[in-house]
Amino acid sequence: MSDINTARLPLSSPMLLPCVGDDILMV
């Protein structure tokens, strides 16, 4: 799942950045 979040990071807007960032930090 982390791979999907990482791939979405550049595609998603900065608004989702903090949400995805939290997931990456947890992993």
Curated annotation (Swiss-Prot):
Stated name of the protein: MSDIN-like toxin proprotein 7
Propeptide stretch(es), residue numbers: 1-10, 19-27
Function noted in UniProt: Probable toxin that belongs to the MSDIN-like toxin family responsible for a large number of food poisoning cases and deaths.
Example of a GO MF term: toxin activity
Residues in cross-link Cyclopeptide (Leu-Pro): 11-18
Post-translational modification, as annotated: Processed by the macrocyclase-peptidase enzyme POPB to yield a toxic cyclic octapeptide. POPB first removes 10 residues from the N-terminus. Conformational trapping of the remaining peptide forces the enzyme to release this intermediate rather than proceed to macrocyclization. The enzyme rebinds the remaining peptide in a different conformation and catalyzes macrocyclization of the N-terminal 8 residues.
Alphabetic keyword roster: Toxin
